[in-house]
């Protein structure tokens, strides 16, 4: 199976998510991204994941690392990967401008110290598993059984799908205050865990991982309107190479010291 995705379709998916989600909240972004991706046929879902990897890799260069350090008080390999997930979710124009010069990130509404979005880089995995789980629940009679036991909680056709999504994306969120809702969550999680499908994307990707020709074909389209990244060394003085972003971060720090801290906020 070859990945089926174009740069226009990839960024149109991102735009639809941005139009619906709270873009300051990764959990909201993950849910709306999942809802979009679970609709895709498997070749396009594979293509979306490959495109995500490609765009994330293209944004891996020293000056972008410096931008991540300014925004998040430092960085590491994993943290920089998560930062680039956030960058992709800012949309095509912001992404392209950041490739031209990461200092252009200063024009965005940046949630400083909160742009390391690990989860959204994995949503394609969850969406694929979600497709398999929906089929499994239906064929195994689980869907009918849960609707019989929890009719008030599963009134709408998509209520169970949302319950499955919540357990995939946030399996450790706080317990429900209503006993019946907590029981539904417990049962859904049990069926997911015992299905053997929670990590089914790993096998799917291994079996359908694109070869070099397919990667090259995909990336020639994905990168067709993007700038070339110049080879450079890690900058020594971030305030000099990224002056706008540096000033914006300094202003944010100053504002935080003037107001009372939020409950639990680090200073």
Could you say what each language-model-derived stretch is?
Residues 256-267:
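Non-Sec secretion/translocation targeting segments of pathogen effectors
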Residues 92-97, 101-242, 246:
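Basic, alpha-helical nucleic-acid-binding regions used in initiation and control of genome expression
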């Amino acid at each position: 199976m070859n990945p089926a995705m174009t740069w226009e379709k990839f960024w149109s998916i991102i735009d639809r998510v941005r139009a619906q989600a709270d873009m300051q909240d990764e959990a909201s972004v993950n849910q709306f991204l999942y809802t979009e991706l679970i609709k895709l046929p498997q070749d396009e879902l594979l293509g979306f994941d490959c495109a995500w990897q490609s765009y994330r890799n293209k944004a891996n260069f020293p000056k972008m690392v410096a931008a991540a350090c300014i925004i998040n008080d430092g960085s590491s390999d994993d943290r920089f990967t998560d930062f680039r997930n956030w960058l992709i979710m800012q949309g095509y124009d912001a992404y392209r401008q950041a490739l031209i010069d990461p200092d252009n990130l200063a024009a965005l509404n940046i949630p400083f110290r909160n742009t390391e979005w690990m989860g959204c880089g994995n949503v394609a995995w969850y969406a694929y598993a979600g497709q398999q789980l929906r089929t499994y629940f239906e064929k195994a009679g689980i869907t009918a059984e849960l609707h019989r036991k929890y009719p008030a909680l599963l009134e709408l056709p998509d209520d169970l799908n949302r319950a499955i999504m919540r357990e995939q994306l946030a399996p450790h969120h706080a317990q429900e205050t209503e006993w019946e809702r907590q029981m539904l969550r417990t049962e859904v999680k049990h069926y997911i865990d015992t299905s053997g499908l929670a990590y089914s994307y790993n096998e799917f990707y291994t079996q359908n991982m694109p070869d070099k020709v397919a990667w090259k074909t995909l990336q020639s389209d994905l990168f067709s309107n993007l700038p070339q990244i110049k080879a450079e060394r890690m900058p020594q003085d971030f305030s000099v190479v990224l002056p706008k972003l540096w000033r914006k971060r300094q202003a944010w720090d100053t504002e935080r010291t003037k107001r009372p801290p939020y409950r639990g906020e680090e200073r």
